[in-house]
Regions:
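Conserved short strand/loop->alpha-helix "switch" segment adjacent to the catalytic nucleotide/phosphoryl-transfer site
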Residues: 20-47, 95-102, 157-166
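Helix-loop-beta hinge of the Bergerat
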Residues: 2-30
């Protein structure tokens, strides 16, 4: 089953619409109260992540499921040049991107990378954990996986790499990391999509 695709932004109105969408799915699939709350929590976290990651960006939200396997989708077309990104950052209180820590920071950087025309030149070893290129050497398409990121962090912690323990601690604090089975963020052209996977029941 696939729900209607609804427009979303970081607004409270859109959050409530997304939560209603989750409740409709829960009712249709006859989920328990606990399962309904889990679906609502993931929806709310995803919407808050969008607001935190992308600010005023507008996108689309929908839910798909096959039986008890649920996918929450959030997609947006992003066209933000490096110059515009710098302008946005200069408008922040500190004038710098303070977000590149923890799961939220990594996801925010992923959205920035997808929005940045200079994505091919961007490189950060901690951010690249969990990345997979999708296409040839000149392709800007990529996908990030939370599971691959967790696995890479585990290895980094075992090897006592700089920053690995802090990144692991931040991941452990993430509601999504505990509630979701998997989170994937992908870029195809200028379209960024985040999918949260969760099996209920």
């Amino acid at each position: 089953m696939k729900t209607d695709i609804i427009p979303v932004s970081g607004s409270e109105v859109h959050l409530q619409e997304a939560l209603r969408q989750a409740e409709k799915v829960a009712a249709f699939e006859e989920l328990s109260t606990r399962e309904t709350l889990q679906l609502r929590l993931l929806t709310e976290e995803m919407m808050q992540m969008m607001h935190s990651i992308a600010g005023p960006m507008e996108g689309e939200f929908w839910i798909e499921n096959k039986g008890r396997e649920f996918e929450l989708h959030l997609a947006a077309d992003i066209r933000l040049t490096s110059g515009k990104r710098a302008k946005l950052l200069s408008a922040s209180t500190s004038g710098k991107n303070e977000a590149a820590r923890g799961l939220m920071g990594h996801l925010r950087d992923l959205f920035d990378r997808g929005a940045d025309e200079d994505v091919a030149r961007f490189s950060s070893s901690m951010l690249d954990h969990g990345f997979a290129e999708m296409g040839g050497a000149t392709s800007m398409d990529w996908e990030w996986s939370m599971i691959q990121y967790q696995n890479a962090l585990t290895t980094s912690v075992e090897n006592d790499e700089e920053g690995a323990r802090e990144a692991w601690d931040e991941l452990e604090k993430s509601v999504v990391a505990h509630a979701a089975d998997e989170v994937k963020v992908s870029l195809k052209g200028s379209r960024v999509e985040m999918v949260i996977y969760k099996r209920l029941g």
